């Protein structure tokens, strides 16, 4: 069984036991959270929401809170010798999917 969930402005296809890297969600490592923005549940019978499925939820356990890889942004102006490099590390949460209810 799989589900398509929406969190942090993005959509993820998840199955039970998957490790998923998502935008930061508040909570401590080991906490269990419920993701109730489920767009679709598939398996033997496919259910598609309009846009969300009422009563469907995905439960997950927080495995890690941290930062993603650094993204470098380089600015320059031609012929002027102006060069700047900026870096950004997005805060992320790693989840392990423990259950899907439809």
UniProtKB/Swiss-Prot annotation:
GO molecular-function term, one example from the UniProt record: rRNA binding
GO CC aspect terms: cytoplasm; ribonucleoprotein complex; ribosome
GO biological process: translation
Keyword set, alphabetical order: Ribonucleoprotein, Ribosomal protein, RNA-binding, rRNA-binding
Subunit comment: Part of the 50S ribosomal subunit. Contacts protein L20.
Family listed: Belongs to the bacterial ribosomal protein bL21 family.
Protein role: This protein binds to 23S rRNA in the presence of protein L20.
PANTHER family linked: 50S RIBOSOMAL PROTEIN L21, LARGE RIBOSOMAL SUBUNIT PROTEIN BL21M
Name of the protein this chain belongs to: Large ribosomal subunit protein bL21
Species lineage: Bacteria, Pseudomonadati, Thermodesulfobacteriota, Desulfuromonadia, Desulfuromonadales
Gene this chain is encoded by: rplU
């Amino acid at each position: 069984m799989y589900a398509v969930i929406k969190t942090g402005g993005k959509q993820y296809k998840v199955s039970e036991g998957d490790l998923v890297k998502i935008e930061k969600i508040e909570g401590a490592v080991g906490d269990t959270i419920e993701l109730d923005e489920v767009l679709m549940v598939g398996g033997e019978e496919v259910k598609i929401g309009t846009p969300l499925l009422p009563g469907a939820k995905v439960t997950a356990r927080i495995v890690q809170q941290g930062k993603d890889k650094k993204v470098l942004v380089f600015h320059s102006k031609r012929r002027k010798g102006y060069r700047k490099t900026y870096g950004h590390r997005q805060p992320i949460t790693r989840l392990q999917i423990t259950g899907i209810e439809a």
